[in-house]
């Protein structure tokens, strides 16, 4: 079969990683795959003036210059449009299925002729967080007639509580078990926690950072590790002496996860939370808020769930994990690893194909 995926851009976000992996999985099964995405957004005149006033030369130099995203790094066939614009029929080949992964690309997909493939909305988030004005457009996009597949039961529930039943199936994300894995290990010599750093408030890096600072009041030797696509910003400060990796190489990620005794997930809004699974696959227990797939993944003693927006509760969980005996921590580590490895991207791709074929 022939598949076309539509993306607004190629970046190193979790959502783009999911598309890249599905494209690889489908290609490995003998299907024809193409990913179509726009060129990077350019700075507006106002943004350029602000960058000059702030002497942010790196932002000016990077304006419009593409960083290799997950699609480019995956090696799957890719078509990059010349500039940020709507995707039209002339941009995509005829196919059996065409998959939109963002509300705007879903609207664009809806306008395409039937020859471009049966329309599929791979729902990776409830994107009302973009701007308050976008809510009506996002909801309208979700109501368009197409085959809908959500990446978590939490996301399906959140959307259908707002919009009513949408005949939506669920195919959970998995983790690349060849990329994310680690041998058994003991606790670190100095207690160490990590989290994904991002400036966007919805990602909750400020909650994780504050939790680390509070935990250090009781565990002064606590080490903190973080990585992210955003450079460190004074508006979202990292804890003192954080080992921070900006845009680390993909093969470096498992080392970062495996260097920690616990991984923190504090998102205010997330449709899944791939770092939870990635850390677990590297034998690192996770302390998380009940957002995205966290509730499904961290039950039965696999990890620790804490209240939303509560750095105090997250800090208490950090302290408790730091004070665990070596044997108890080892048990948590093995449970996390086992949970992450019970379901693979191969399984997810099989479920995706089954959903498409049965529809």
Regions found by a protein language model. Give the residues of each.
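Aromatic "clamp/platform" in nucleotide-sugar-dependent glycosyltransferases that forms part
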Residues: 268
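Conserved donor-binding/catalytic core segment of Leloir-type glycosyltransferases
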Residues: 147-150, 185-203, 209-216
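A short, well-ordered alpha-helix in the C-terminal region of glycosyltransferases
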Residues: 327-342, 354
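Short alpha-helical donor nucleotide-sugar binding micro-motif in glycosyltransferases
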Residues: 255-260
């Amino acid at each position: 079969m022939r598949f076309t995926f539509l993306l607004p851009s190629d970046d190193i976000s979790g959502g783009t990683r999911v598309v890249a992996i599905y494209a690889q999985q489908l290609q490995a099964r003998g299907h024809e795959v193409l990913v179509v995405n726009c060129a990077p957004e350019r700075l507006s005149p106002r943004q350029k003036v602000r960058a000059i006033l702030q002497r942010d030369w790196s932002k000016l130099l990077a304006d419009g210059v593409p960083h290799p995203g997950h699609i480019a790094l995956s090696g799957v066939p890719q078509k990059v449009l010349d500039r940020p614009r709507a995707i039209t029929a002339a941009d995509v080949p005829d196919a059996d299925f065409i998959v939109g992964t963002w509300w705007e690309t879903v609207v664009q997909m809806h306008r395409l002729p039937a020859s471009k493939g049966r329309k599929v909305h791979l729902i990776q988030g409830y994107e009302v967080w973009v701007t308050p004005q976008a809510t009506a457009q996002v909801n309208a996009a979700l109501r368009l007639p197409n085959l809908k597949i959500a990446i978590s039961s939490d996301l399906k529930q959140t959307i259908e509580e707002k919009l009513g039943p949408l005949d939506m199936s669920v195919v959970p994300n998995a983790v690349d078990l060849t990329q994310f894995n680690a041998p058994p290990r003991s606790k670190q010599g100095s207690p160490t926690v990590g989290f994904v750093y991002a400036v966007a408030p919805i990602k909750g890096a400020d909650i994780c950072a504050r939790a680390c600072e509070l935990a250090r009041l009781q565990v002064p030797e606590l080490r903190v590790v973080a990585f992210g696509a955003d450079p460190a910003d004074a508006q979202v400060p990292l804890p003192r002496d954080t080992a921070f990796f900006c845009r680390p190489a993909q093969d470096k990620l498992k080392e970062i996860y495996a260097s920690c005794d616990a991984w923190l997930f504090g998102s205010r809004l997330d449709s899944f939370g791939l770092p939870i699974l990635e850390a677990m696959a590297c034998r690192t227990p996770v302390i998380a808020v009940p957002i995205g797939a966290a509730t499904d993944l961290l039950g039965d003693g696999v990890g620790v769930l804490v209240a939303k927006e509560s750095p105090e509760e997250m800090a208490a969980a950090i302290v408790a994990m730091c004070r665990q005996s070596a044997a108890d921590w080892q048990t948590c580590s093995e449970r996390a690893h086992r949970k992450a490895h019970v379901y693979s991207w191969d399984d997810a791709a099989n479920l995706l194909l089954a959903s498409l074929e049965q529809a």
